[in-house]
Amino acid sequence: MVNKSKKFSTKCVHEGEIKDTMYQGIVSPLFMSTTYPWYGGEDAEKKPYPRYFNTPNQEFLSKKIAALENGEKALIFSSGMAAISTSIMANVKSGDHIIFQEDLYGGTRNFIKTEFGKYGIEYSFTKGLDSNHFSDEIKDNTVGIYIESPSNPLLKIVDLKAISSIANQKSIWTMIDNTF
C-alpha cells in the first residue's frame, strides 16, 4: 500500500530505501547484477536469479516509482521499446484492432509492422492527429488507442482529453507514451 501522507520530496528521497543493516550505511547500497550463482531445484523459488528483476536495486527503483506515481506497483524495463512492446502485448489478443497515431516513433512503428501480423493483431494509423481522425479508425474489434504526446520525432501535441473521451465512449483503452 502506498503511503500518501508523505510529501513528494520525501518520497523522492526515502521511498523504497534499502536498509544497510550490516554497516549502517545511510544511502542505499548498489548491488551489481553482473554475476550471480544459479540456485536450481527447490532453492530456485527462494533465491531467484537476480538478472530477472530481483536485485535489491530493481526493487528499490520500482517501489520509488510506484510511490511517486501514487501506484501500488511499478515495472521497470531495460529500454523504452521493452516497455512499449510489453505494455501493448499485455493488452491485446489475436483478432483485436488498435489505432495508432500517424506521427509515431520509428521503433514503435517497426514493432507494429513486423510483429502484429504474427499474432493476428490488426492495426491502423490515423490520417492526422485531430481527434476526429481517431474516431474514423474505430472498428467493431478495436480495443485500444495508442498515442504519444508529444510525438516522436516531430513533437506534435495530441488532444489527450478529446481522444480519451472518444475511447471512453467506445469502452476502449488508451495508452500514452509521454517519454518526452
Which residues does each predicted region cover?
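N-terminal "arm"/small-domain region of PLP-dependent enzymes with the aminotransferase-like
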Residues: M1-T55, K63-K64
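Buried hydrophobic positions in well-ordered alpha/beta secondary-structure cores of metabolic enzymes
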Residues: Q24, I65, A83, I98, ...
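Conserved N-terminal alpha-helix of the aminotransferase class I/II PLP-enzyme fold
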Residues: T35-A82, G107-T114
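Conserved PLP-anchoring active-site segment centered on the Schiff-base-forming lysine
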Residues: A90-G107, T126
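Short acidic/histidine-rich motifs immediately flanking catalytic phosphotransfer sites
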Residues: K93, I138-I145
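Short, small-residue-enriched loops and turns at beta-alpha junctions
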Residues: G106, S131-N132, P150-L155
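Hydrophobic beta-strand scaffold residues
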Residues: Y123, T174-M175
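Active-site core of PLP-dependent enzymes with the aminotransferase class I/II
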Residues: S151-W173, F180
